[in-house]
């Protein structure tokens, strides 16, 4: 009898542990609905084995307990031969796996080699605390952390109690909770999901929150540009984590058909890239991009080969064959690789996502212009003063930025971001003009403020608005926000606005449980209220795709003071009004955020380049794809692209071959500013005067050459190929005017009488400008042998010889493309490769 009793006890324990393999969620649809929610160490079945979590109480009476599953493997460890390879599904394990402690972080440099300008403020201000989260590092780092609420949170209770807000009808099964996967930032080089505790967000919003570690730096994004190492392994890790969630989250009470990805900084860029990748199709439904897009200068690495060769040379793996170099790097210890100091150009990255033709099929902006959104709902926004770290180096004192420091910073900015030398002076002066407060131009504090706005507008605001506009053009739901609040912390400059990463403590509910080592702020009741507001918006969006529904804004549980967000309805962003929500202590819905400056970067700056192109080039041009990825397949080729917008919108013109330019925003008919009008007027006047000058010069040269030919040609002579006969070159000893002497020297240099004068002097066609906005100056050759055009002979001496080719490290050429080739090593055999 006692044996039978033991068997019955064991059977009951097994049933509490989650049922049989492949079964549903233990104890009912969610942990909070069964006995598991009451256990200290609940056990859940997954497709790969059983995992044991831990129940945690939160430091707030309105928040219920959360079950944490920490360090759940979502992929096979990328060790040995699996380094620089796409991830594989994890192997099954016997028994019960403990998931009660945080997993190791992925290998990264601990010596602060990454420039501070590329990291969030809370990270750089608390480096010692941040270092404690990445002390435990291992190449075996592909793990998830899950935070599962055990009971309905305050938001669900408020929704059910609201008489004017009926229960959400969009939720198919109220027992299944939405899932939110957070992608951490850190310039693709640093960070870990362990830094972000999702417990408060999960408990307050009644959602399952997941964080993850993915491969970083050289181990996550090294690329040779060919099949030896295609790169994007960190992105593939994120896709594998989404596959794991789709397959297993139902066992934890989650809804695999309501998965939202969200991230900040580089994590937000990953969110945008996953939207554009067909490998992630069907794995998530909504996306939140906080302070990051795929079209900023730091989002994509357009020089992967350069930095791979630099790294290989540093560790003794510089080989002529790319496969041999990668194999050598694969044998090196991970610590030796990540500790190498490979510095990128300022405002760029050394190791990050690349356009590989598969995971990232094409330049992200091209994909967005072609509607590669695949029907994702999107919430996107920026902080008020994202560029704080860019300005702190230039601020010499509390009095602000001096005039010389302002000029130097702008010049350095242009030199590092724009690759055509002839137009740099014009662009530099135009930027200074646009970002000078002419009413108070000698005020150092005002110069600091405008410099902060310059970096914020260029690196964050303009790319975010362009992304939202491209998204809305295809009738996809998109909501835009601007974040105008930050917590009070020691050491923070009084003049600083909400900087890069300042929204994160409010998204994760830190004010509700008090200051932490990473966010050592003096949180007030206003901070708690604002955090509740942000979590309500974010989790509403994860539930329905609408941040306003199903839960209304109500924070009376904090204090009796009215919540101003209760009367605010967050409107969708559209291409005409571009509505956005101002998130701060005084919320409001407005339109056309920083419209003048956004138009400057998206319209006037490309227009300045077009004027330069028309002035210095003729009809002889490079092939349209000579300096960028090959064109897409013909329109009739099969694909999964989203259909064009409905007929209710005016059709957008088809892009013409050649250098691209941003499309003008439809409906932007407003008067931008006096400064912008003056700039355009001055530019147009200079263009007109130059055209007149060149016309007169051409006429004068042609007239003199005609007279000279008549003087030098003997009557009735022939034999030179010149009309009228006679030699084209003058007789010995006869002096020529300067402009005729230059023509003579050009003809001699070009091979004498038989040479074509048009072959003597031809400058190159400038590169694609909109890509040059995001590439380092040496990404694209400024002179190419095949791009020759004729300049007037009186303009000056011949130009210098062309510089070396695009990538100075030539031993890694990509293999010749074939019509049927695809990447068999990636998780999916299908591909939209344009090569």
Curated annotation (Swiss-Prot):
Where in the sequence does glycosylation occur per the annotation? 98, 136, 522
Q: Which residues lie on this side of the membrane: Extracellular?
A: 15-677
Chain intervals for the UniProt region annotation (Disordered)? 623-668, 790-835
User: Where found in the cell?
Assistant: Cell membrane; Postsynaptic cell membrane; Presynaptic cell membrane
* Signal sequence extent: 1-14
Which is one Gene Ontology cellular component term of this protein?
A: cell surface
Protein name, entry field = Neuroligin-2
Q: State the organism named in the record.
A: Homo sapiens
Gene this chain is encoded by: NLGN2
């Amino acid at each position: 009898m006692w044996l039978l009793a033991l068997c019955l006890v064991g059977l009951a324990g097994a049933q509490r542990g989650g049922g049989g393999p492949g079964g549903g969620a233990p104890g009912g649809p969610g942990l909070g609905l069964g006995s598991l929610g009451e256990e200290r160490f609940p056990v859940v079945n997954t497709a790969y084995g059983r995992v044991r979590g831990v129940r945690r109480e939160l430091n707030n009476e309105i928040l219920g307990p959360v079950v944490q599953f920490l360090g759940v493997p979502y992929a096979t460890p990328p060790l040995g031969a699996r380094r620089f390879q796409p991830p594989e599904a994890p192997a099954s394990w016997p028994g019960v796996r403990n998931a009660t402690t945080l997993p190791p972080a992925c290998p990264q440099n601990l010596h602060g080699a990454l420039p501070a300008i590329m990291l969030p403020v809370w990270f750089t201000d608390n480096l010692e605390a941040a270092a404690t989260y990445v002390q435990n590092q291992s190449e075996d780092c592909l793990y998830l952390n899950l935070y599962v609420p055990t009971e309905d949170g305050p938001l669900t209770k408020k929704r059910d109690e609201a008489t004017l807000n009926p229960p959400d009808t969009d939720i198919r099964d109220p027992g299944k909770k939405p899932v939110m996967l957070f992608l951490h930032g850190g310039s693709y080089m640093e960070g870990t999901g362990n830094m972000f505790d999702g417990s408060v967000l999960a408990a307050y919003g009644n959602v399952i929150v997941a964080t993850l570690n993915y491969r970083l730096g050289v181990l996550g994004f090294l690329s040779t540009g060919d099949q030896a190492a295609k790169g994007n392994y960190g992105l593939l890790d994120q896709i594998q984590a989404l596959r794991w969630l789709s397959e297993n989250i139902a066992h934890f009470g989650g809804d695999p058909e309501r998965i939202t990805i969200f991230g900040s900084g580089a994590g937000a860029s990953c969110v945008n890239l996953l939207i554009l990748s067909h490998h992630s199709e069907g794995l998530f439904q909504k996306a939140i991009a906080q302070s990051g897009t795929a079209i900023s200068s730091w989002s994509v690495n357009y020089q992967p080969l350069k930095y791979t060769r630099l790294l290989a040379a540093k560790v003794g793996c510089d080989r002529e064959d790319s496969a041999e170099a990668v194999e050598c790097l694969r044998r090196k210890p991970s610590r030796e690789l990540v500790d190498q100091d490979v510095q990128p150009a300022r405002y760029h990255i050394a190791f990050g996502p690349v356009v590989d033709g598969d995971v990232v099929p094409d330049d992200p902006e091209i994909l967005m212009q072609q509607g590669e959104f695949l029907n994702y709902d999107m919430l996107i926004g920026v902080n008020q003063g994202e560029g704080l770290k860019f300005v702190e180096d230039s601020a010499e004192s509390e009095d602000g930025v001096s005039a010389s420091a302002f000029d130097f910073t702008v010049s350095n900015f242009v030199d590092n971001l724009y690759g055509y030398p002839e137009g740099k002076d014009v662009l530099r002066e135009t930027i200074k003009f646009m970002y000078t407060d002419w009413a108070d131009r000698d005020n150092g504090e005002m110069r600091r403020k405008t410099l902060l706005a310059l970096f914020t507008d260029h690196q964050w605001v303009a790319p975010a608005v362009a992304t939202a506009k491209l998204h809305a053009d295809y009738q996809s739901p998109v909501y835009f926000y601007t974040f105008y609040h930050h917590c009070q912390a020691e050491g923070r400059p009084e003049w600083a606005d909400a900087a890069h990463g300042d929204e994160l403590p409010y998204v994760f509910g830190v004010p509700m449980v008090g200051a932490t080592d990473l966010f050592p702020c003096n949180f007030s009741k206003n901070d708690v209220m604002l955090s509740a507001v942000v979590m309500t918006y974010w989790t509403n969006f994860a539930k329905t795709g609408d941040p306003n529904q199903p839960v209304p804004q109500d924070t009376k549980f904090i204090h009796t003071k009215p919540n101003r967000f209760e009367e605010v309805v967050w409107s969708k962003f559209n291409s005409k009004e571009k509505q956005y929500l101002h998130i701060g202590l005084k919320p409001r819905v407005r339109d056309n955020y920083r419209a003048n400056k956004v138009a400057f970067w998206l319209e006037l700056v490309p227009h300045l380049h077009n004027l330069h192109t028309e002035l210095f080039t003729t009809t002889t041009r490079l092939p349209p794809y000579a300096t960028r990825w090959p064109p897409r397949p013909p329109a009739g080729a099969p694909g999964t692209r989203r259909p064009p917008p409905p007929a209710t919108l005016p059709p957008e013109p088809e892009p013409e071959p050649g250098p691209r330019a941003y499309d003008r925003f439809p409906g932007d008919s407003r008067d931008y500013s006096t400064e912008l009008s003056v700039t355009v007027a001055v530019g147009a006047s200079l263009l007109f005067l130059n055209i007149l000058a060149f016309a007169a010069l051409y006429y004068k040269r042609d007239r003199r050459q005609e007279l000279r030919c008549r003087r030098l040609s003997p009557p009735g002579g022939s034999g030179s190929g010149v009309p009228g006969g006679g030699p084209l070159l003058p007789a010995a000893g006869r002096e020529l005017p300067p402009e005729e002497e230059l023509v003579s020297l050009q003809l001699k240099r070009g091979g004498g009488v038989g040479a074509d004068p048009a072959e003597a002097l031809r400058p190159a066609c400038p590169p694609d400008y909109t890509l040059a906005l995001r590439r380092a100056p040496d990404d694209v050759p400024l002179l190419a042998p095949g791009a020759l055009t004729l300049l007037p002979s009186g303009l000056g001496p011949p130009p210098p010889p062309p510089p070396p080719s695009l990538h100075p490290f030539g031993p890694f050429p990509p293999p010749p493309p074939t019509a049927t080739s695809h990447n068999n090593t990636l998780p999916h055999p299908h591909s939209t490769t344009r090569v």
